[in-house]
Amino acid sequence: MLLDSECLVLPRVPVQLLDCYRGGGPVLGAPRRLDVFLSLLRRLEYTSTLDMRMFSTSLLKSVRLDGIEEAANAIETDFVLPFRASAFQFHKYKLLMDLFLPSQDLLDVDESLSTVEKCLLHKMVSSTVQPWERGDENVQCPLSVQQRQSMTQSNQRVRSRCPIEDGVIQTHWGTISPGTVIGAIASALESQRVSITDILKANVYKEEVSQQFMEAALEEWTKKSEHYKEDEEDSFNQVDVQSSDASINNIWVATLAGDLAEVVVNQGPRVGAFADRLMVGSNNRWNDTILPRDYYLLIQNSTTIDWHFTDAEILAGIDGLILAKYMPTWVAQRRTLRLSQVIEMYYSNEGVSFEPSVRACNRQALFQNIIDTTQLYTEASRFAHILSLRQITVYVPLEEMQRITEAAVSTFMNYVPSLLRQNHRECEVTRNVPVVDLIVATDAAWKGYDVEQFMSWIGGALEVDAQRSSIGLLHGNTGQWIVPPSSNLTGFFDQLQNSTVDWPNRLNLPNVISAVKRHSRNQTLRDIEDMSSAGHSTLALIFSPSDRPSAIELDRARDLMMSLRNSYFDVYFAYAAQDLTDFQNINNVYLDYSELFLKLPSTSVLDAITAVETHIVNSAVPMRIFGPQCPVNGTEYSQTPYEDFVIPGREQNYRIHPFYLRQQPLVTTEFRNDGQGRILVCMWRGSETSHACQTINERDSYAFNLTTPCPSPDFCPPARFVVSALSTLNLCAHKDCRLPNQVGYYIRHTGTRCLPLLGSSAHNNSLWKALVVLPLISLIELIFLEI
C-alpha cells in the first residue's frame, strides 16, 4: 500500500497537464478514434524502456486524472486555474491509484509528445463530463416547443442539456473509455487483493474521512465478519461479502465493480435500493461519426446527474475484465509485448494473436464466460462502502449498502445484453491496406469542414500511422502545402486547425502537378541520401467535383505530366469528378496504368468516400523497388536492403518499373526471412496469370532472377512481387513491429538500371526518355487496382 505522500493523487491539475487547461487549452482537432489513440501510445512506447506493467501504471499516473471540471463562476488569472478534479469520477480514480495500483510516474510525456498530442491523450483517457452550457445546444440538442415554453431564466451558470463526455474514443465495436481498459491491464499485471481493514487503518485513506465514520465502519466490519473466512488463492474466486479477512481485488475496482460502486454511492442514498430507479448506461451520440470530436450525453433531466456508469465505461469495463484474464499468460509468453499491441489486436477482426478468439467482435460470448454476478456483487459492495466514506457526507450502514448494490447489479445485468447487441459487429475477413504517400488536392466544391471530414476518414482507412503511410493536403489553386505530408493524424489536424490559408476557389491543375513533381524530386533525393532501395509509392488524389480545367491549363498540364513521367515512375494519379473527360486526356503517352478515374455522382463527401474506398483503399497500389542513383564524377551510390513486415492474412505488394529493367542482362531480387515465421513470395510480369512462388522458411532467403528482363524495346512489363505470411511465431519484438505476429523480411536487389537524376548523369535524360514510352504495355499489364 502506497504511503509516500509525494506519490498520492491530488485533485489539482498536475504541472505536466497545466498546458491542457491554461487559456482553455489547445484546439484538439484530431478525431477521438482508436487509431489516433494507438498512434499516441506508440510514440510513447517507442522512446520508453519500460515493460508493459510499468508503462501502463506510469501512463495512468502521468496523463490520466478523472473528474476534472471547470468551476461554475471562477475566472482564470495568473494565479487561479478554474479547473480541478472535483467531480465524482475523481474519488474512484484516487482510491485506485493510491491503494490498489500504487505507482510512480516514470514517463516523461513531454519528451515524446507535443503539447497537442499530450493533451489529446489526456482527454482520451481521463473520464469526466463537461457539464456547463456551451452555446451550441440549439444545434446539437434542440428543444421541443413544450420544453422551450417551460424553461426558466437563471442568473447562475446553466448546465448543458447535452454535456460532453470526455475520456472516450470511437471503435468499430462501440465507443469505449480507454482509461478503464488500461487500468484493467495494469491491474492484471500487478494483481492484488487489498484487505478492507488495512484500507480503513491506512493513513492515506483515513486522513480525509471523519473519525466518526471511521469508527462506525470498523465496528461494522468487525462485528459482521467474526464468523467468516475467505479463500483468496484466485483473484477471480467467489468471496463472501462479510468474510473476516474481506478484501477487494484491484482488477474489479479498475473495471465493472468500481463503476458500479459509483452508481451505488451517488444514486443509492437518493433513490433507495430499487432496481427500477437506479440508472445504468447512457444515451450518447457523436457530433460526427466520420470526424468524431465530441461525444454528447443526451440526458433526460439537466438538473440531475445520471451518468455514473455510461455505455462507454460499461463496454470498456467488460473489455478490460476480459483482457485481464489473459494478460499474465500473454506477457509470460512474450515479455516484449506492448500495450498498444494488445489493445489494437483486441479491437481488430483478427483478434489477439496468442488467443484469436479474444476480440471485441466476440465480446458477447466472452462476457458470458467471464462474468460472475456473485463476484460482481461482492466486489462492488465492498468497494462502494470504501468509496462512500470518502465521497459522501452521510454514513450509509453496510447492510443498506449491500441492498443498494444488489439492486444495482440487477439493473446492470438487465441492461448489458441490449448494449452488447447494439454495439455488436460481426467478425470480418481482414483486408489489405495499401501503403502509400497520399497527396490530396481539391477544387472549390469543398470547404474547410468537408476537407477535414475526408482527411479524417482517409487517415483511418489507410491506417496512416500504423502502416507508416503519410497524407498531405495541397491547395488546389496555388499548389502550396496546406498541410505537408505527415504520418501523424494528430499533428496533421493541428496544422490544419492552425492554417491561415484560404480554401481554394478553383482547381489549377498545372500548379497541382508541379507540386507533385517537386515532392517526387525531394523524395527521390531523400532516397538517395538514405541509400533506400524501396519505399512507398506516391498517390495524388485530385478532387474536382465542380470545376473543369481550361484549354490552356490542359496543355500545360500535359507538358508537366510528360516531364514528371519522364523522371519519376512510381507516382499514381487519381481524378475524382462528375465529368472526367478533360482529365482522361492529360496523359496519353505513358500508358502504364498509373492513373485512375473516379466518377462522382455529386459533390458530397460521402459519395467521394464511397468511390475512394472502392477504387483506392480496397486496391493493391504496390510499393516501389527502384535502382540507385547513377555514378557522378566517380562517386558511387549504394543502397541498403529494405526491411518490411507482413501481417498474417494480409499481403504486401511491390513493383519494379520497366525503366529499371531495360538494357539490363540480369536483375536479381532477393527476399530474406528475418525469422518470425514462414513467408510466401510470388513474382509475375505484366498480365501473366501464372506466378512464380516460393516459400521461404525462417532465416532462409530466395532470389528471383530476371535474365534479359526486356527482350525487345517495345516489350517490357514491370516485375511485381507479393509477400504473405504462411505462419507466425509471435516473435516480432523490434520497435518497428506493429504487432507481435508480424513476420519481417529484407529485400535486396542487384542489376537494376541506375537513375540519372544528379550531376552529369542527368544529361542522359534524352537517351532514356523514349525508352519509357511503352506502347505495348497497355496490352500486357494489368491495371494495378485489380492485382
Language-model region placement:
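C-terminal GPI-anchoring signal of eukaryotic secretory precursors
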Residues: 754-772
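C-terminal edge strands of extracellular/lumenal beta-sandwich accessory domains
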Residues: 120, 141-142, 147, 162-163, ...
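MIDAS-like acidic motif and immediate structural context at the N-terminus
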Residues: 1-8, 12-30, 34-68, 72-89, ...
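VWA/integrin I-like adhesion module and closely mimicked acidic/polar interface patches used
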Residues: 407, 411, 546-600
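Acidic, Ser/Thr/Pro-rich low-complexity intrinsically disordered segments
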Residues: 452, 650-652, 656-692
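Acidic, polar low-complexity linker/tail segments
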Residues: 368-438, 445-450
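Von Willebrand factor
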Residues: 55-58, 62, 66, 71, 479-542, 547-555, 575-582, 618, ...
